[in-house]
A protein has these predicted regions:
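Long, well-ordered alpha-helical scaffolding segments within enzyme catalytic domains
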Residues: 138-157
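Alpha-helical scaffold segments that mediate packing/assembly in large oligomeric complexes
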Residues: 153-178
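Conserved alpha/beta core surface patches that mediate binding of polyanionic ligands
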Residues: 83-123
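Broad gene-expression machinery/nucleic-acid interaction feature
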Residues: 62-64, 73-75, 101-103, 122-126
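A generic structural motif
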Residues: 13-17, 126-137
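Short, flexible loop/turn elements at secondary-structure junctions
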Residues: 48-50, 82, 106-109, 131-133
């Protein structure tokens, strides 16, 4: 197996502080963006029944990690995408227009090409929101992007105050060009 140092990555924090920083980052970003976009947390599945079709194959070539559940007489797949599942969850949780969900997906993508940003194991934060037909336009999309960038910058600012070692990285700006 390759280590991060083999891939040209040099961490700013030790291993334990990296875990603490990741946990804090997740909590801060969830709270900040969740409040700004009216999102609520929903737990994501670790696996889905293969027959449901909810495990989106992203670009058509991913092979799911599959296993049988003998007592249930069913086959399951470890998730590698929540695209379809999120839309079903919006319906099942009875979200309304202007509301949405965020979730933290833990997945296995067996066919992933590995590098500094990609791993076979995926811990991915994701969100989905119901918008009105009148909001399906470029202005609404641009405002949503500005909100996301602002939440990212606010999260980074707080994270850097807790972990000063991260100040070696450039701060995120809040200006967005389209």
């Amino acid at each position: 197996t390759r280590r991060s140092s083999d891939l040209g990555y040099a961490p700013c924090l030790n291993l334990y502080d990296t875990q603490k920083a990741i946990g804090l980052l997740k909590r801060l970003f969830e709270d900040t963006l969740g409040g700004a976009l009216h999102l609520r947390r929903v737990s994501a599945p670790l696996f889905v029944e293969a027959s449901t079709g909810l495990n989106d194959d992203l670009n058509g070539v991913e092979r799911a990690v599959s296993f049988d559940i003998p007592d249930a007489g069913r086959d399951a797949q470890v998730v590698h995408s929540l695209a379809k599942w999120k839309r079903m969850a919006l319906y099942r949780y009875q979200f309304s227009v202007g509301e949405g969900l965020y979730t933290d997906m833990n997945a296995i993508r067996r066919d992933e090409e590995l590098d500094n940003l990609h791993s076979v194991y995926v811990d991915q934060w994701d969100w989905e929101k119901i918008i009105a037909p009148r909001d399906r336009n470029a202005d609404y999309l641009r405002q949503t992007v500005r909100t996301i960038v602002s939440a990212m910058a606010e999260t980074q600012h707080t994270l850097r105050s807790v972990f000063p070692q991260l100040t070696a990285l450039p701060p995120l700006g809040t200006e967005v060009s389209f």
